[in-house]
Amino acid sequence: MNNTQRIIVLDTETTGMNSVGPPYLNHRIIEIGAIEIINRRFTGKKFHTYIKPNRLIESDASKIHGITDDFLSDKPSFKDIAKDFFNYIKNSELIIHNASFDVGFINQEFSMLTKKIQDISNFCNIIDTLKIARKLFPGKKNTLDALCMRYKIKNSHRVLHGAILDAFLLGKLYLLMTSGQESIIFNKNIQNERNFRYIKKSITKKHRFLKIIKANKTELKLHNEYLKFLKEK
């Protein structure tokens, strides 16, 4: 894969899953979180939305992600965000953990709206990190939590599943799994996805060759003015 290729790391949350047949059958997506990586670095550009599913969330699913029917009552439907979402992911390397699950749901959502998009794999290259993990660690548990523990990524803040937070964790894991690097630790300021903040990377000895770019006086002034504006909101 070319490092300049636009990578999108994606995760979804749903109303639940079908126990017999396709997991997506009779269920809907309620949250999409996606984060962009270029040149093996997070760009800070993301796509994040909650979605009103027009059906009730199963109690077991709500226990996993903490999203409720009341919370989604005023959120957009998938048709309202479909165009922006498609434009965000098209022509990208789409990184997903257990991709068949999320892709099945996404394909169902698009197929309900248009015949032009029946399978997103026709518009982007899908990479399943679960398959990568199983090749690297055959016979071991390869859930997101298990991989975070294995690669020493601190995720104690991850009390509930959430698409945007899980996408960031998965992005870190993907970079580690494809670089041979053993561990990375990042700032504890990650909040629940509903209060998402861009996460600062810890600088380790392995990164000391990177050039540190400091803000100039004008940039610092603008930054301080922005912080003042936020406090006044």
Curated annotation (Swiss-Prot):
One of its GO terms (molecular function) is metal ion binding. SMART domains: EXOIII. It is an enzyme of class 2 (transferase). One of its GO terms (cellular component) is cytosol. The keyword Ligase does not apply. Substrate binds at D11, E13, D60, H65, D166. Its cofactor is Mg(2+); Mn(2+). A divalent metal cation 1 binds at D11, E13, D166. A divalent metal cation 2 binds at D11. InterPro entries: DnaQ, DnaQ_proteo, Exonuclease_RNaseT/DNA_pol3, RNaseH-like_sf, RNaseH_sf. It holds the Pfam family RNase_T. GO terms for biological process: DNA replication proofreading. The keyword Magnesium applies. Keywords: DNA replication, DNA-directed DNA polymerase, Exonuclease, Hydrolase, Magnesium, Manganese, Metal-binding, Nuclease, Nucleotidyltransferase, Transferase. Gene3D superfamilies: Ribonuclease H-like superfamily/Ribonuclease H. It catalyses: DNA(n) + a 2'-deoxyribonucleoside 5'-triphosphate = DNA(n+1) + diphosphate. Its EC number is 2.7.7.7. The active site is at H161 (proton acceptor). Binds 2 divalent metal cations. Magnesium or manganese. DNA polymerase III is a complex, multichain enzyme responsible for most of the replicative synthesis in bacteria. The epsilon subunit contain the editing function and is a proofreading 3'-5' exonuclease. The DNA polymerase holoenzyme is a complex that contains 10 different types of subunits. These subunits are organized into 3 functionally essential subassemblies: the pol III core, the beta sliding clamp processivity factor and the clamp-loading complex. The pol III core (subunits alpha,epsilon and theta) contains the polymerase and the 3'-5' exonuclease proofreading activities. The polymerase is tethered to the template via the sliding clamp processivity factor. This is DNA polymerase III subunit epsilon. The gene is dnaQ.
